[in-house]
Amino acid sequence: MKICTVCKNNKIEFFLNIKNLDYWQCELCKATMLNPIHYISSNKEKKHYLKHNNEIDDTRYRDFLTNLIEPLKDKICVNDIGLDYGCGYAPALADILKKDGFNIELYDPFFFKNENIFFRKFNFITCSEVVEHFFKPYEEFNKIDRLLAGKSWFAVMTLSLIHISEPTRHTRSR
């Protein structure tokens, strides 16, 4: 691996090995990334996601998603149009927002491959437990950026490397 997949910096170095998987870290942005030699096929990736227990009506999962939803709801309006990017096969986050009166579209490359979303703009985009799965994050973040309307929000929830059991929350105003 020679280039950071997040910021395209060429100063990355070996960071750690977990379960025989090599991870690299960028000196500039501090992103930690899996060495591409360990990437799995899209068929294996889809099978992996189908093993997730993220059922749409699971109360514990819905409670977990409020870590992303509640701060976002303070920033958006009911008339805003949102996108749940990487929603998975059971789009619980979108279901919660819809029940709260928000308009939200779905996109997932395996389960809701709605290519029409790439010709639209959204007032907010959510990514819950998604960005850590991007093989090409630089390209994905640019794709997402092109989908954001002016004065919009991109809400991300992912696991941190240090506190793997605690979700971290980041929102960015455009």
Per-segment meaning from a language model:
Residues K151-L159:
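Conserved beta-strand signature within the Rossmann-like core of class I S-adenosyl-L-methionine
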Residues F134-F135, L148-G150:
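Helix-to-beta-strand junctions that scaffold the AdoMet/dcAdoMet cofactor pocket
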Residues I162-R174:
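Single conserved hydrophobic/aromatic residue that forms the stacking wall/gate
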Residues S128-V131, M157:
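Residues lining the SAM
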Residues M1-F124, S128, Y138-F141:
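Conserved N-terminal segment of class I S-adenosyl-L-methionine
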